A protein has these predicted regions:
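Aromatic-lined carbohydrate-recognition surfaces of secreted/lumenal glycan-active proteins
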Residues: 174, 178-200, 251-262, 288
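N-terminal substrate-binding region of glycoside hydrolase catalytic domains
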Residues: 29-129, 259-262, 287-288
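Substrate-binding cleft of secreted/luminal carbohydrate-active enzymes
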Residues: 36, 43, 253-314
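Substrate-binding cleft of extracellular glycoside hydrolase catalytic domains
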Residues: 81, 86-189, 289
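Acidic (Asp/Glu)-rich catalytic clusters
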Residues: 58-65, 82-100, 134-142, 204-208, ...
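Bacterial N-terminal signal peptides
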Residues: 10-19
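Distinct, well-ordered alpha-helical segments
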Residues: 196-209, 266-267
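Glycoside hydrolase catalytic-domain groove-lining segments
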Residues: 85-103, 205-208, 212-262
Length: 314
Protein backbone atom coordinates (compact mmCIF):
# COMPACT_ATOMS: atom_id res chain seq x y z
CA UNK A 1 0.00 0.00 0.00
CA UNK A 2 1.41 3.35 -1.01
CA UNK A 3 0.86 5.05 2.33
CA UNK A 4 2.48 2.33 4.41
CA UNK A 5 5.37 1.93 1.98
CA UNK A 6 6.14 5.61 1.93
CA UNK A 7 5.92 6.01 5.68
CA UNK A 8 8.10 2.96 6.21
CA UNK A 9 10.68 4.40 3.84
CA UNK A 10 10.62 7.74 5.61
CA UNK A 11 10.84 6.29 9.10
CA UNK A 12 12.97 3.21 8.62
CA UNK A 13 15.19 3.58 5.57
CA UNK A 14 17.61 5.72 7.52
CA UNK A 15 18.52 2.64 9.53
CA UNK A 16 19.80 0.97 6.35
CA UNK A 17 23.34 1.35 5.04
CA UNK A 18 23.44 3.49 1.93
CA UNK A 19 24.92 1.86 -1.15
CA UNK A 20 27.43 4.66 -1.63
CA UNK A 21 29.77 6.64 0.54
CA UNK A 22 29.29 10.42 0.46
CA UNK A 23 30.87 13.36 2.23
CA UNK A 24 29.06 14.63 5.31
CA UNK A 25 28.80 18.07 3.76
CA UNK A 26 29.96 19.97 0.73
CA UNK A 27 29.78 19.44 -3.01
CA UNK A 28 32.19 17.44 -5.13
CA UNK A 29 34.41 19.47 -7.44
CA UNK A 30 34.21 17.07 -10.36
CA UNK A 31 33.44 18.80 -13.63
CA UNK A 32 30.99 16.30 -15.06
CA UNK A 33 27.40 16.07 -16.22
CA UNK A 34 24.64 17.28 -13.95
CA UNK A 35 23.91 13.83 -12.50
CA UNK A 36 27.38 12.37 -11.91
CA UNK A 37 27.19 9.06 -10.05
CA UNK A 38 29.53 10.26 -7.32
CA UNK A 39 28.25 13.80 -6.92
CA UNK A 40 26.90 15.01 -3.59
CA UNK A 41 25.14 18.36 -3.64
CA UNK A 42 23.92 18.64 -0.04
CA UNK A 43 24.16 22.10 1.56
CA UNK A 44 27.58 23.02 2.87
CA UNK A 45 27.59 23.22 6.66
CA UNK A 46 30.02 25.23 8.78
CA UNK A 47 30.17 26.21 12.44
CA UNK A 48 28.17 29.35 11.61
CA UNK A 49 25.44 27.64 9.59
CA UNK A 50 21.72 27.90 10.23
CA UNK A 51 20.53 24.61 11.76
CA UNK A 52 20.36 21.94 9.03
CA UNK A 53 18.01 19.00 8.68
CA UNK A 54 16.54 16.71 6.05
CA UNK A 55 13.63 14.66 4.85
CA UNK A 56 15.69 11.62 3.93
CA UNK A 57 13.86 8.53 2.62
CA UNK A 58 17.00 7.48 0.71
CA UNK A 59 19.19 7.41 3.84
CA UNK A 60 21.84 9.76 2.48
CA UNK A 61 21.92 11.59 5.82
CA UNK A 62 22.18 8.49 7.99
CA UNK A 63 25.76 9.20 9.04
CA UNK A 64 25.65 12.97 8.60
CA UNK A 65 26.41 14.40 12.02
CA UNK A 66 25.59 17.91 10.81
CA UNK A 67 21.89 17.19 10.36
CA UNK A 68 19.88 18.12 13.46
CA UNK A 69 16.27 17.77 12.23
CA UNK A 70 14.64 14.58 10.94
CA UNK A 71 11.64 15.45 8.75
CA UNK A 72 8.80 12.94 8.39
CA UNK A 73 5.67 13.03 6.23
CA UNK A 74 2.55 11.05 7.05
CA UNK A 75 -1.14 11.06 6.15
CA UNK A 76 -3.70 10.95 8.89
CA UNK A 77 -5.56 8.05 7.25
CA UNK A 78 -4.31 4.55 6.39
CA UNK A 79 -1.08 4.88 8.35
CA UNK A 80 0.77 2.64 10.79
CA UNK A 81 1.59 5.04 13.62
CA UNK A 82 3.54 2.38 15.50
CA UNK A 83 6.45 3.06 13.15
CA UNK A 84 6.87 6.51 14.71
CA UNK A 85 8.73 4.86 17.58
CA UNK A 86 11.37 3.66 15.11
CA UNK A 87 11.76 7.19 13.80
CA UNK A 88 12.10 8.46 17.34
CA UNK A 89 14.86 5.97 18.15
CA UNK A 90 16.64 6.80 14.90
CA UNK A 91 16.47 10.54 15.62
CA UNK A 92 17.57 10.23 19.24
CA UNK A 93 20.55 8.10 18.25
CA UNK A 94 21.64 10.98 16.01
CA UNK A 95 20.65 13.78 18.40
CA UNK A 96 17.99 15.11 16.04
CA UNK A 97 14.59 16.62 16.68
CA UNK A 98 11.53 15.53 14.69
CA UNK A 99 9.58 17.68 12.24
CA UNK A 100 6.37 15.81 11.45
CA UNK A 101 4.31 16.97 8.48
CA UNK A 102 0.74 15.68 8.81
CA UNK A 103 -1.25 15.69 5.58
CA UNK A 104 -5.05 15.57 6.00
CA UNK A 105 -5.79 12.81 3.53
CA UNK A 106 -4.79 9.26 2.66
CA UNK A 107 -1.99 8.22 0.32
CA UNK A 108 -4.13 5.34 -0.93
CA UNK A 109 -4.68 5.55 -4.68
CA UNK A 110 -8.43 5.18 -4.32
CA UNK A 111 -8.83 8.07 -1.83
CA UNK A 112 -11.47 10.39 -3.25
CA UNK A 113 -12.61 13.21 -0.97
CA UNK A 114 -13.17 16.63 -2.51
CA UNK A 115 -12.01 19.90 -0.95
CA UNK A 116 -15.42 20.94 0.37
CA UNK A 117 -16.22 17.52 1.81
CA UNK A 118 -12.82 17.37 3.51
CA UNK A 119 -13.25 20.82 5.03
CA UNK A 120 -16.78 20.08 6.21
CA UNK A 121 -15.59 16.82 7.71
CA UNK A 122 -12.79 18.51 9.64
CA UNK A 123 -14.98 21.29 10.98
CA UNK A 124 -17.70 18.78 11.81
CA UNK A 125 -15.34 16.67 13.89
CA UNK A 126 -15.30 13.69 11.55
CA UNK A 127 -11.48 13.61 11.52
CA UNK A 128 -10.86 14.46 15.18
CA UNK A 129 -9.96 10.84 15.88
CA UNK A 130 -7.38 10.87 13.09
CA UNK A 131 -5.51 13.85 14.47
CA UNK A 132 -5.91 12.61 18.03
CA UNK A 133 -4.29 9.32 17.04
CA UNK A 134 -1.34 11.05 15.39
CA UNK A 135 -0.76 13.42 18.29
CA UNK A 136 -1.25 10.75 20.93
CA UNK A 137 1.40 8.65 19.21
CA UNK A 138 3.72 11.65 18.93
CA UNK A 139 3.24 12.36 22.64
CA UNK A 140 4.95 9.05 23.41
CA UNK A 141 8.13 10.05 21.57
CA UNK A 142 11.20 11.22 23.44
CA UNK A 143 12.59 13.50 20.72
CA UNK A 144 11.51 17.15 20.55
CA UNK A 145 8.58 17.34 18.12
CA UNK A 146 7.31 20.03 15.76
CA UNK A 147 3.95 19.43 14.05
CA UNK A 148 3.41 20.88 10.57
CA UNK A 149 -0.16 20.48 9.33
CA UNK A 150 -1.56 20.97 5.79
CA UNK A 151 1.36 22.76 4.18
CA UNK A 152 1.47 25.15 1.19
CA UNK A 153 -2.19 26.00 1.57
CA UNK A 154 -2.07 29.21 -0.49
CA UNK A 155 -0.77 27.55 -3.67
CA UNK A 156 -3.72 25.84 -5.37
CA UNK A 157 -1.77 24.32 -8.27
CA UNK A 158 -3.73 21.10 -7.93
CA UNK A 159 -1.27 19.26 -5.70
CA UNK A 160 -3.08 19.43 -2.35
CA UNK A 161 -6.81 19.07 -1.71
CA UNK A 162 -6.70 21.56 1.19
CA UNK A 163 -5.13 24.23 -1.01
CA UNK A 164 -8.52 24.69 -2.70
CA UNK A 165 -10.09 25.99 0.51
CA UNK A 166 -10.55 29.71 0.91
CA UNK A 167 -8.57 31.49 3.60
CA UNK A 168 -11.39 31.51 6.15
CA UNK A 169 -11.98 27.80 5.74
CA UNK A 170 -8.31 26.98 6.09
CA UNK A 171 -7.87 29.12 9.21
CA UNK A 172 -10.89 27.52 10.87
CA UNK A 173 -9.68 24.03 10.00
CA UNK A 174 -6.13 24.73 11.16
CA UNK A 175 -7.28 26.09 14.49
CA UNK A 176 -9.64 23.17 15.02
CA UNK A 177 -6.94 20.60 14.29
CA UNK A 178 -4.26 22.28 16.42
CA UNK A 179 -6.70 22.55 19.33
CA UNK A 180 -7.26 18.79 19.05
CA UNK A 181 -3.55 18.04 18.84
CA UNK A 182 -2.60 20.23 21.79
CA UNK A 183 -4.88 18.24 24.08
CA UNK A 184 -2.59 15.26 23.52
CA UNK A 185 0.70 16.98 22.68
CA UNK A 186 1.00 20.27 24.57
CA UNK A 187 4.80 20.20 24.52
CA UNK A 188 5.12 20.29 20.73
CA UNK A 189 5.97 23.28 18.59
CA UNK A 190 3.40 24.03 15.88
CA UNK A 191 4.56 25.12 12.45
CA UNK A 192 2.34 27.06 10.05
CA UNK A 193 3.83 26.41 6.65
CA UNK A 194 2.78 28.41 3.59
CA UNK A 195 4.70 27.97 0.37
CA UNK A 196 5.60 31.66 0.40
CA UNK A 197 3.29 32.95 -2.32
CA UNK A 198 1.50 36.28 -2.56
CA UNK A 199 -1.70 36.30 -0.50
CA UNK A 200 -0.44 33.98 2.21
CA UNK A 201 -1.23 36.48 5.00
CA UNK A 202 -4.95 35.75 4.70
CA UNK A 203 -4.24 32.16 5.77
CA UNK A 204 -2.39 33.08 8.97
CA UNK A 205 -4.26 31.39 11.85
CA UNK A 206 -3.10 33.79 14.57
CA UNK A 207 -0.20 34.00 16.99
CA UNK A 208 -1.82 31.62 19.46
CA UNK A 209 -1.63 28.82 16.89
CA UNK A 210 1.85 29.37 15.48
CA UNK A 211 5.21 28.80 17.16
CA UNK A 212 7.30 28.84 14.00
CA UNK A 213 6.71 29.52 10.30
CA UNK A 214 7.98 27.14 7.62
CA UNK A 215 8.53 28.05 3.96
CA UNK A 216 9.18 25.97 0.84
CA UNK A 217 12.08 27.04 -1.39
CA UNK A 218 13.10 25.25 -4.57
CA UNK A 219 15.51 26.11 -7.36
CA UNK A 220 15.34 24.24 -10.68
CA UNK A 221 17.67 25.44 -13.40
CA UNK A 222 15.58 24.41 -16.45
CA UNK A 223 12.58 26.23 -14.98
CA UNK A 224 14.69 29.31 -14.20
CA UNK A 225 15.80 29.49 -17.82
CA UNK A 226 12.20 29.53 -19.05
CA UNK A 227 10.75 31.80 -16.36
CA UNK A 228 13.43 34.48 -15.94
CA UNK A 229 15.98 33.67 -18.63
CA UNK A 230 18.85 33.04 -16.19
CA UNK A 231 19.85 31.11 -13.09
CA UNK A 232 18.27 32.20 -9.82
CA UNK A 233 19.99 32.17 -6.43
CA UNK A 234 18.98 30.86 -3.03
CA UNK A 235 18.56 34.37 -1.65
CA UNK A 236 16.51 35.44 -4.66
CA UNK A 237 14.12 32.50 -4.32
CA UNK A 238 13.84 32.78 -0.53
CA UNK A 239 13.39 36.52 -0.08
CA UNK A 240 9.81 37.01 -1.38
CA UNK A 241 8.31 34.41 0.95
CA UNK A 242 10.50 35.45 3.87
CA UNK A 243 9.49 39.08 3.48
CA UNK A 244 5.81 38.09 3.41
CA UNK A 245 5.99 36.27 6.76
CA UNK A 246 8.58 38.22 8.74
CA UNK A 247 5.96 40.70 9.95
CA UNK A 248 4.28 38.00 12.03
CA UNK A 249 7.24 38.13 14.42
CA UNK A 250 7.79 34.37 14.57
CA UNK A 251 10.93 32.30 14.03
CA UNK A 252 11.18 31.22 10.40
CA UNK A 253 12.48 28.00 8.87
CA UNK A 254 12.68 26.52 5.42
CA UNK A 255 10.71 23.32 5.91
CA UNK A 256 11.41 22.10 2.38
CA UNK A 257 14.49 23.05 0.36
CA UNK A 258 15.57 21.56 -2.93
CA UNK A 259 17.69 22.51 -5.91
CA UNK A 260 18.75 20.85 -9.14
CA UNK A 261 20.83 21.94 -12.11
CA UNK A 262 24.33 21.64 -13.47
CA UNK A 263 27.36 21.51 -11.19
CA UNK A 264 27.81 25.28 -11.01
CA UNK A 265 24.14 25.84 -10.18
CA UNK A 266 24.12 23.16 -7.47
CA UNK A 267 27.41 24.39 -6.00
CA UNK A 268 26.08 27.93 -5.69
CA UNK A 269 22.90 26.82 -3.94
CA UNK A 270 24.77 24.39 -1.69
CA UNK A 271 27.13 27.15 -0.59
CA UNK A 272 24.32 29.61 0.19
CA UNK A 273 21.45 27.53 1.59
CA UNK A 274 22.50 27.19 5.23
CA UNK A 275 24.71 30.26 5.39
CA UNK A 276 23.49 33.03 7.71
CA UNK A 277 22.21 35.87 5.52
CA UNK A 278 21.69 39.46 6.60
CA UNK A 279 18.45 39.39 4.61
CA UNK A 280 17.05 36.62 6.83
CA UNK A 281 17.81 37.45 10.49
CA UNK A 282 14.94 35.32 11.82
CA UNK A 283 15.86 32.17 9.87
CA UNK A 284 16.41 29.36 12.37
CA UNK A 285 16.60 26.18 10.27
CA UNK A 286 16.87 24.91 6.69
CA UNK A 287 15.56 21.39 6.05
CA UNK A 288 16.46 19.67 2.79
CA UNK A 289 13.86 17.68 0.82
CA UNK A 290 16.00 14.73 -0.25
CA UNK A 291 13.72 13.07 -2.78
CA UNK A 292 12.35 13.41 -6.27
CA UNK A 293 9.56 15.88 -6.85
CA UNK A 294 6.20 14.15 -6.63
CA UNK A 295 4.43 16.14 -9.37
CA UNK A 296 5.68 17.52 -12.71
CA UNK A 297 6.62 21.20 -12.70
CA UNK A 298 5.02 23.79 -15.02
CA UNK A 299 6.42 24.64 -18.45
CA UNK A 300 6.91 20.95 -19.28
CA UNK A 301 10.20 20.73 -17.37
CA UNK A 302 9.32 17.40 -15.78
CA UNK A 303 9.92 16.24 -12.22
CA UNK A 304 13.04 17.69 -10.62
CA UNK A 305 15.29 15.32 -8.71
CA UNK A 306 16.24 17.09 -5.48
CA UNK A 307 18.22 14.15 -4.08
CA UNK A 308 21.65 15.14 -2.85
CA UNK A 309 23.32 12.01 -4.19
CA UNK A 310 22.70 9.95 -7.30
CA UNK A 311 20.86 6.66 -7.04
CA UNK A 312 21.63 5.23 -10.49
CA UNK A 313 19.50 2.10 -10.04
CA UNK A 314 16.32 4.07 -9.25
Amino acid sequence: MKSLFKLSAVLLCGACISGGVYAASGVSGASVDSRNQFRDKRPIITADSVTPGAYDPHADYTNDTNSKIEHLFLPWEDVDLATLSAADAYARERERSLLITVEPWSWARDWRVGPEDLLAGILGGRYDANMSAVCSAAAQLKSPVTIRWAQEMEDNDGQFTWAFWNAEGYVNAYRHVIDICRKHLPSAQYMWSPKGEEGLAAFYPGDKYVDIIGLSVFGYQPYDKLEVGRDTTFVERTKPGYDRVTGFGKPIAIAELGYEGNDEYARDWAAEANKPHAEFPDMTAVVYFNDREVYPWPRNVGRPDWRVANHPLD
